[in-house]
């Protein structure tokens, strides 16, 4: 396992070695949950049901990436991360299951293999079968400026490999 943002924060950016549960169920978390209310993703073509607010580990990500943390003021304002505006991002905090894949028609069944070694469900979804920030972003990989995208080739031939793990086209 690599170090998330090792160039900037190391492990202590997210973890604290001597405060085992600052948030219930989140061992070694070095922070508090965000208190902002977020504008969630919305689209007429989206077939899933998104939680009213971010859930799961996305809430942990947003404790820093919510636009209120001065340590992240350097983030590109053209991107919607680092703010309470999630309406233009990839949706998070929704169940991705076989029923959604069938209904949508452009999503792979989560029981299919991913390019990471197991199934989409095992590699990318949280324990509640939900898509979260960590579905696409591997927080334990170094490489600031690359958004820590899972299985993404940052070489000259890069393309939408990550997107195609779930999306048919």
Task: Indicate where each model-derived feature is located.
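C-type cytochrome heme-c attachment and multiheme electron-transfer modules
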Residues: 1-12, 16-169
């Amino acid at each position: 396992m690599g170090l998330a943002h090792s160039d900037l924060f190391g492990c202590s950016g997210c973890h604290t070695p001597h405060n085992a549960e600052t948030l219930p169920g989140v061992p070694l978390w070095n922070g508090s949950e965000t208190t902002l209310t977020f504008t969630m993703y919305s689209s007429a073509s989206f077939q899933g049901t998104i939680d009213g607010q971010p859930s799961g580990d996305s809430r942990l990500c947003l404790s820093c990436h919510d636009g209120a943390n001065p340590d992240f003021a350097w983030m590109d304002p053209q991107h919607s991360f680092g703010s309470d505006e999630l309406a233009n991002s990839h949706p998070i905090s929704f169940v991705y299951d076989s029923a959604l894949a069938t209904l949508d028609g452009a999503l792979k069944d989560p029981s299919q293999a991913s390019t990471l070694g197991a199934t989409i469900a095992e590699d990318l979804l949280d324990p509640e079968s939900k898509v979260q920030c960590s579905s696409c972003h591997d927080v334990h990989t170094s490489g600031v400026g690359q958004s820590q995208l899972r299985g993404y080739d940052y070489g000259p031939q890069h393309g939408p490999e990550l997107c195609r793990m779930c999306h048919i086209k």
